[in-house]
């Protein structure tokens, strides 16, 4: 039996998150708090050894992955000769395009507040959740699943909208039957790892890690409950 593990988490906090601004594909840096959140994510996955690491092409995701890996002692094999991390950047896991809403406050802007969301309805000038799911599905089928089937471990650091898209791709959320139902609006905390355990390419268990007790239990292959996520910073 081939056992592989996929770990996914969102990047750390940015100023756009802090100020409730829609981010989408805009490339904004981590705040000091976001950098510390990334390091904490690394401490949570300490003891896990990854064969492959991926991030989106945006700096907030890549830097979160690098800072997280820097807190681990079991992933030095992913370091390049110059000491930087071998993290593959993939455009298929870039944040959902916020289009005309990018840079605007999603709590107070009336156009955003009153926009009727649907799974297959894109925001003005941007993407729908359905479109994001399609490209995340392509990324998973081409880059991740073959590695899990070989019993390898994969780290993916991305964005809130992409974590939601992974829910559909991995089967932990159901795609609306008519394609036009409500989108996944699950709150996604910054830099909080979720572990997906696979056997022979099939998902058998998943859980979120938010304390050291859980990661210790995970490393011992013991079942642990999903912890309630801390409130996230919004916006991509």
What kind of region is each of these model predictions?
Residues 2-4, 74, 96-107, 150, ...:
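Acidic, low-complexity terminal tails and accessory targeting/binding regions
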Residues 6, 152-160:
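Generic beta-sheet signal
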Residues 13-64, 125-137:
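Loop-to-helix element that buttresses phosphate recognition and phosphoryl-transfer chemistry
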Residues 39-113, 117, 189:
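Phosphate-coordination/substrate-recognition cap region in phosphate-metabolizing enzymes
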Residues 47-49, 143-152:
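Glycine-rich phosphate-binding loop signature in dinucleotide/nucleotide-binding domains
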Residues 112-131:
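Short glycine/proline- and acidic residue-enriched helix-loop micro-motifs
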Residues 160-164, 204:
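GST superfamily/GST-like fold recognition
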């Amino acid at each position: 039996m081939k056992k592989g593990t996929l770990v996914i988490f969102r990047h750390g906090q940015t100023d756009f998150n802090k100020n409730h601004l829609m981010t989408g594909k805009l490339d904004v840096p981590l705040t000091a708090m976001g950098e510390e959140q990334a390091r904490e994510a690394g401490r949570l996955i300490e003891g896990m050894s990854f064969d492959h690491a991926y991030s989106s092409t945006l700096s907030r995701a890549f830097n979160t992955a690098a800072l997280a890996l820097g807190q681990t002692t079991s992933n030095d094999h992913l370091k390049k000769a110059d000491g930087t991390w071998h993290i593959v950047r993939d455009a298929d896991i870039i944040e959902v395009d916020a289009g005309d809403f990018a840079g605007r406050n999603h709590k107070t802007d009336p156009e955003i507040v009153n926009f009727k969301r649907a799974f297959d309805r894109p925001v003005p000038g941007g993407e729908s959740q359905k479109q994001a799911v399609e490209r995340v599905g392509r990324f998973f089928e081409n880059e991740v699943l073959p590695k899990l089937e070989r019993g390898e471990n994969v780290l993916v650091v991305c964005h809130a909208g992409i974590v939601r898209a992974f829910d559909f791709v991995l089967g932990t959320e159901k795609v609306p039957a008519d394609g036009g139902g409500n989108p996944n609006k699950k709150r996604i905390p910054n830099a909080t790892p979720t572990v997906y355990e696979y056997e022979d390419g099939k998902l058998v268990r998943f859980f979120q890690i938010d304390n050291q007790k859980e990661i210790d239990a995970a490393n011992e292959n013991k079942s642990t409950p999903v912890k309630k996520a801390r409130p996230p910073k919004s916006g991509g």
